């Protein structure tokens, strides 16, 4: 009997679950898991995770005491909720969980460093080694600078909202543990910009972007791991078979599992040495110049930060409302 695509993918790529839904993680048994503000907000609204939300709120109230305002308690709980989900996820998976720093700090190097240290302290207080946590930070220049400091402290980072080679090179040159180049969001931009309704997987601009980044890293010997993210269909995933890691939503994991057929390896470090690309050094000037020249990366990075900020604000409101309900009961 032929193997399904998911089983074959696992042979050449580390499969990661892109979700805060603990039941989905139990079902697909990925090595690692990634969360973001939108995914945590979605999970926090699922009835089966109400206990996690309530326990986090009660813990925040206990820490701050009866004199703290509801807004202060909700704010403290908000800081802890992603870690609460992360701790549950780490009970299921063998590897690492990615927990995101507040997206509103995306252009604040010091603020990002402080928030990342706080997140790691919370995990360590719960008995989890920092080796099992990746701190997710938006790949702005300020975010990359923050991650470089954190990596020197032994705090591993996952640079997200990555849409261009300039962001990827800056991460590699700063010794970042892992990057999450986005595939589907790049496709979205090109479809909207060109009016073209579809792209074959091998022509997909998001696939081509990750392929370029992967080959650049392997050709020039960078250790930073490449984890393709943000997929719109399984064709994008199968075109990136062989990538170091791919983080995939449960619906697409299910589709891969239900699909049989041959899955050839597409990305291979042995072939990268012949990839036609020159080495580029990226400092702040080069980064800003390349970013300004890349309209897609500029627009998608801003849109991504705004989207995560909106999800954070929604979560803060949800927590404040839930706290009011709990304390009125």
From Swiss-Prot:
Per UniProt, which keywords does this protein have? Cytoplasm, Pentose shunt, Schiff base, Transferase
Subcellular localization is given as: Cytoplasm
Q: In which pathway does it act?
A: Carbohydrate degradation; pentose phosphate pathway; D-glyceraldehyde 3-phosphate and beta-D-fructose 6-phosphate from D-ribose 5-phosphate and D-xylulose 5-phosphate (non-oxidative stage): step 2/3
List the catalytic residues. 136 (schiff-base intermediate with substrate)
Gene Ontology MF term list: transaldolase activity
Enzyme Commission designation: 2.2.1.2
Disulfide linkage: none
Catalyses: D-sedoheptulose 7-phosphate + D-glyceraldehyde 3-phosphate = D-erythrose 4-phosphate + beta-D-fructose 6-phosphate
**Could you tell me which InterPro entries the record lists for this protein?**
Aldolase_TIM (IPR013785), TAL/FSA (IPR001585), Transaldolase_1 (IPR004730), Transaldolase_AS (IPR018225)
Q: Main localization of the protein? A: cytoplasm
Please provide one cellular component term from the Gene Ontology annotations of this protein.
cytoplasm
Any one biological process term the GO annotation gives: carbohydrate metabolic process
Q: How would you summarize the oligomeric state and partners of this protein?
A: Homodimer.
What task does this protein carry out?
Answer: Transaldolase is important for the balance of metabolites in the pentose-phosphate pathway.
Q: State the family it belongs to.
A: Belongs to the transaldolase family. Type 1 subfamily.
Please give the name of this protein. Answer: Transaldolase
């Amino acid at each position: 009997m032929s193997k399904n695509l998911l089983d074959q993918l696992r042979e050449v790529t580390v499969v990661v679950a892109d979700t805060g839904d603990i039941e989905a993680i139990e079902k697909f048994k990925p090595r690692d898991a990634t969360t973001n503000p939108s995914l945590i907000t979605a999970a926090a609204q699922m009835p089966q995770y109400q206990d996690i939300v309530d326990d986090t709120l009660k813990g925040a109230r206990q820490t701050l005491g009866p004199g703290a305002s509801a807004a202060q308690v909700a704010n403290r709980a908000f800081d802890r909720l992603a870690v609460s989900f992360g701790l549950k996820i780490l009970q299921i998976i063998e590897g690492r969980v990615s927990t995101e720093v507040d997206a509103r700090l995306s252009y604040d190097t010091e603020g990002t460093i402080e928030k990342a240290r706080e997140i790691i302290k919370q995990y360590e207080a719960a008995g989890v080694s920092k080796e099992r946590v990746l701190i997710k930070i938006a790949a702005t220049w300020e975010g990359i600078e923050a991650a470089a400091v954190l990596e020197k402290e032994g705090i591993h980072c996952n640079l997200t909202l990555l849409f261009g080679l300039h962001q990827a090179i800056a991460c590699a040159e700063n010794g970042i543990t892992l990057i999450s180049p986005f595939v589907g969001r790049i496709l979205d931009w090109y479809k909207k910009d060109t009016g073209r309704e579809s792209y074959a997987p091998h022509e997909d601009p998001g696939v081509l972007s990750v392929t370029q980044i992967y080959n650049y890293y392997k050709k020039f010997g960078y250790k930073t791991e490449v984890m393709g993210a943000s997929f719109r269909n399984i064709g994008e995933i199968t075109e990136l078979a062989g990538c170091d890691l791919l983080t995939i939503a449960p619906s697409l994991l299910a589709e891969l599992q239900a699909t049989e057929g041959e899955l050839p390896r597409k990305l291979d470090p042995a072939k990268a040495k012949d990839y036609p690309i020159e080495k580029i050094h990226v400092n702040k000037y080069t980064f800003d110049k390349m970013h300004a020249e890349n309209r897609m990366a500029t627009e998608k990075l801003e849109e991504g930060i705004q989207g995560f900020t909106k999800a954070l604000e929604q979560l803060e409101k949800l927590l404040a409302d839930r706290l009011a309900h709990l304390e009125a009961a």
